Swiss-Prot record:
InterPro entries: Calcineurin-like_PHP_ApaH, LpxH-like, Metallo-depent_PP-like, UDP-diacylglucosamine_Hdrlase. It catalyses: UDP-2-N,3-O-bis[(3R)-3-hydroxytetradecanoyl]-alpha-D-glucosamine + H2O = 2-N,3-O-bis[(3R)-3-hydroxytetradecanoyl]-alpha-D-glucosaminyl 1-phosphate + UMP + 2 H(+). It is a peripheral membrane protein. This is UDP-2,3-diacylglucosamine hydrolase. It comes from Xylella fastidiosa (strain M12). Mn(2+) 2 binds at residues 41, 79, 114, 203.
Length: 250
């Protein structure tokens, strides 16, 4: 049996082919799995569980089918969908996990994160993250009208694109990649803090398997891929793990 781990699907009505691929993935792989973990950014935008969305409705119904059949489903919020709450979780049949958290995968304690916590060189993003994850901010934000929340979300996305463009203009390609990737010292500190030898995260859209030494211990950091040009899934079982690509329909 296998545990499946994915992230960064960024499901959006403007990219129906990715939703189609995700639903096919559920049909073909999840029904026989030990568990499915979604480590954030399942959706491109999420402004509250009361947000009308045909894509979200379709996804919830599909996930619920497998939850009802006995497959454990877990969701860790990402930077795009950290407002996914208890109402949607109940509809979809998944359990919301804290970021970060440690789970046991076939006897191996494994640290799961979305991944943005490790990108501390991007100071502006970390400040925005701290502001928007504050419980008081969230509570106040969710009292606003849907139109007001949508306007804030659109403005935040424009600001994010402008920030990324600014970083590209102000830095050469090597420095830009460094700023927008994880900070090695933070990775090492996270391993040491949680006392594990394996970490799995998404966010950076740079799928890879990294081997490193932390305090003389051999550690593994797995980076999940995004679902833009293809799908990406990490398959974990008692024998190890494999990163696989999924071809888009058509």
């Amino acid at each position: 049996m296998t545990t499946l781990i994915i992230s960064d699907l960024h499901l959006d009505p403007l990219r129906p082919v990715v939703t189609e691929l995700f639903l096919r993935f559920l049909r073909e792989q999840v029904s026989g799995a030990d568990a499915l973990y979604i480590l954030g950014d399942l959706f491109e935008v999420w402004i509250g569980d009361d947000m009308p969305s045909e894509v979200a409705d379709m996804v919830a119904a599909a996930l619920r089918t497998y939850a009802d059949a006995g497959t454990p489903l877990y969701f860790m919020p990402g930077n795009r969908d950290f407002l996914v709450g208890a109402d949607y979780a109940a509809r979809a049949g998944f359990r919301i996990l804290p970021d970060p958290c440690v789970v046991d995968l076939y006897g191996e304690p494994t640290l799961l994160l979305h991944g943005d916590l490790l990108c501390t060189d991007d100071i502006a993003y970390q400040a925005f993250r701290a502001q928007t994850r504050d419980p008081e901010f969230i509570a106040q934000f969710l009292t606003q009208t849907l139109s007001a929340r949508l306007a804030f979300s659109q403005q935040a996305r424009l600001a994010s694109h402008a920030h990324q463009s600014g970083l590209k203009q102000e830095n050469d390609s090597t420095q830009f990649e460094k700023i927008t990737d994880v900070v090695p010292a933070d990775v090492a500190a996270m391993f040491a803090c949680y006392g594990v030898n394996r970490m799995i995260h998404g966010h950076t859209h740079r799928p890879a398997l990294h081997m490193l030494q932390v305090a003389e211990c051999a550690c593994t950091r797995v980076v999940l891929g995004d679902w833009y040009q293809q799908g990406s899934v990490l398959c974990v079982d008692a024998d190890g793990l494999v990163l696989e690509q999924l071809l888009l329909p058509g």
